């Protein structure tokens, strides 16, 4: 977000109803496709061979290297700035932080798949909270 977007009392331009409609259409369509995408990739032998037991990052390494995001969560560290240092209106939303157990590429992939669904739900919640 650009610094000029946020203004005293709000933002430079509120979300339009057209954009809201486009977002809600996308979320509905994407949410329906998540299972299809997951089935296609998660059950794929080649995908599994290339992701499982590859690119291990353990708990200590994740901290030592200063990783963030899915790299931390894949190593078993439940870190999400939206929950831990609630800024904007994230304190009005309830969601949990998906974490991995092995710290490999497959864990990080599975976290991302889980986040796809959670993001769709969060977008719907945001629209309700913002009363759009």
Language-model regions, residue ranges each:
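Active-site bordering "gate/hinge" segments
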Residues: 1-132
């Amino acid at each position: 977000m650009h610094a000029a977007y946020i203004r005293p009392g709000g933002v430079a331009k509120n979300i339009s109803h057209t954009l809201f409609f486009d977002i809600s259409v996308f979320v509905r369509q994407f949410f329906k496709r998540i299972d299809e995408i997951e089935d296609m990739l998660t059950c794929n032998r080649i995908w599994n061979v290339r992701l499982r037991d590859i690119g291990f990052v353990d708990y200590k390494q994740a901290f030592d290297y200063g990783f963030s995001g899915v790299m931390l969560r894949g190593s078993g560290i439940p870190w999400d700035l939206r929950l831990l240092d609630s800024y904007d209106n994230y304190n009005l939303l309830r969601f949990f932080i998906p974490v991995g157990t092995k710290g490999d590429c497959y864990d990080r992939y599975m976290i991302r798949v889980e986040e796809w669904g959670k993001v769709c739900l969060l977008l719907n919640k945001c629209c309700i909270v913002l009363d759009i």
